A protein has these predicted regions:
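Bacterial Sec-dependent N-terminal signal peptides
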Residues: 1-29
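Structural recognition of the beta-strand scaffold that forms the well-ordered cores
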Residues: 37-43, 72-79, 116-121, 151-156, ...
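Aromatic-lined carbohydrate-binding/catalytic grooves of carbohydrate-active enzymes
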Residues: 59, 63-164, 170
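Aromatic-lined carbohydrate-recognition surfaces of secreted/lumenal glycan-active proteins
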Residues: 115-131, 179-196
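Carbohydrate-binding surface patches
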Residues: 280, 286-289, 294-296, 332-370
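Catalytic cores of secreted or luminal carbohydrate-active enzymes
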Residues: 281-330
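C-terminal beta-strand-rich structural cap/linker in extracellular carbohydrate-active enzymes
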Residues: 387-409
């Protein structure tokens, strides 16, 4: 009897070890879908429901020929309002007026430009804007997306139960369906950070997960109606840095750079626009935290300052660094904040941010970087290199962020 119990115990341990190994292999395989944070253009903030295939083709042409693809922006993310219901076989279909050529033809066109195509659905029966969603049709929709040539699915959580176990189950069901669809399709968990997705989204199959409610085109939420400003999302993301890594990213939502208060949904709930200093801080901190980068401005009619911020290859290189670590905040007295991010090749990135409404003089002891006698500081926004010893000092304007890559001499 004792021997039988011993053998049973060994068998159970072997089964448990096998299941754990299988889960690890599954997570590892899914992680490979986004080894660096995805970059691209998302339709929602500027166009909301006013989208069509001609617009997507124009955006693809622009990205392929005017610096965006070269800088790393490979995706076009079609957000809500593309759906046209279901056909007689319950296959989800695009709106025939908006996408008369069909999604496969559009995906083929986007791919011909060297780009990737993302699409949107919801883990309920309806999307946030009231269109057909995928709950109950996960396997069927995943196969349809694969047949179309879709590369990424943003999966929202409107009209779904406010329960983390239910959310985990619904996202995992779609992730499994995508994995079995015959095509590699990354999954973006868009649950807005309310059910602690950092604890379960990766295990559910997500390549990234939202940390907050939707971003608005503003520095800070003052009206308190549910919109999130740039600094609000930074504050939420700060303590979550340990959850980020290759294939599983903290999604801080879209970049509002260049919207200038003229977007659609981004301009409600107090979203009156930002200064370009604030836009530059958003780009800086999204890159420091290794967030996906989804531009959302009028990309077909943009100004030079917007392009300067969004196409800066040095700040993008920090975002896309292969080590995949997110920045962490270090103790520093005063009104300014200091963030460090470890980079590949024995390098570091450091960001000094002034979140206050007044200029701040900063004297930063370089001992926080280590015990080297001298450092090379590369200013990624000014594109200048300097030697620094003991203390770095400067005056930062309100809401300004300085970012440097640092190497020892």
């Amino acid at each position: 009897m004792i021997e039988q119990l011993s053998n049973l115990r060994k068998s159970l341990l072997l089964i448990a070890a096998f299941l754990l190994a299988s889960l690890h292999m599954t997570a590892t395989n899914r992680d490979s879908l986004a080894l660096t944070p995805p970059m691209g253009f998302m339709t929602w903030n500027k166009y909301k429901e006013d989208i069509n295939e001609q617009l997507i083709r124009q955006i693809a042409d622009k990205m392929a020929t005017d610096g965006y693809a070269e800088a790393g922006y490979k995706y076009i993310f079609i957000d809500d309002a593309w759906q046209g219901g279901r056909d007689q076989r319950n296959n989800i279909i695009p709106d025939p007026k908006k996408f008369p050529s069909g999604m496969k033809a559009l995906a083929d066109y986007v791919h011909s430009k060297g780009l990737l195509l993302g699409i949107y659905s919801d883990a309920a029966q309806l999307t946030c804007a009231g269109y057909t969603a995928s709950y109950g049709f996960e396997e069927q929709d995943a196969k349809t997306f694969a047949e179309w040539g879709i590369d990424y699915l943003k999966y929202d959580y409107c009209h779904a139960p406010s329960d983390s176990a239910v959310a985990h189950k619904r996202y995992k069901k779609m992730a499994d369906a995508l994995q079995n669809s015959g095509r590699k399709i990354a999954l973006g968990v868009c649950e807005w950070g309310q059910l602690n997705p950092e604890m379960w989204a990766r295990q559910a199959g997500g390549s990234l997960w939202r940390v907050s409610f939707d971003v608005r085109d503003m520095w800070k939420d003052i009206v308190k109606q549910g919109g999130m400003g740039i600094i609000d999302i930074i504050n939420i993301t700060e303590p979550l840095y340990k959850y980020a890594g290759p294939g599983h990213w903290l999604d801080m939502d879209m970049l509002v750079v260049g919207l200038d208060g003229k977007g659609g949904p981004s301009s409600d709930l107090g979203g009156v626009g930002c200064t370009y200093t604030e836009y530059q801080t958003q780009m800086s901190m999204w890159c420091m935290f290794a967030s996906p980068l989804a531009v959302s401005h009028d990309i077909l009619n943009e100004n030079a300052e917007t392009r300067r911020i969004l196409l800066n290859k040095e700040i993008i290189a920090i975002n896309q660094d292969a080590l995949g670590e997110a920045a962490h905040r270090v103790d520093f007295p005063g009104a300014c904040r200091v963030y460090l991010r470890n980079l590949s090749g024995n390098r570091q990135a450091i960001a000094i941010m002034n979140p206050s409404d007044t200029p701040q003089r900063v004297q930063l002891p370089l001992s926080i970087l280590g015990n080297a006698k001298e450092y090379n500081f590369r200013d990624v926004w000014e594109h200048k290199t300097s030697r620094q010893r003991k203390v770095w000092q400067a005056t930062l304007q309100p809401h300004e962020t300085k970012v440097f890559t640092v190497t020892t001499r």
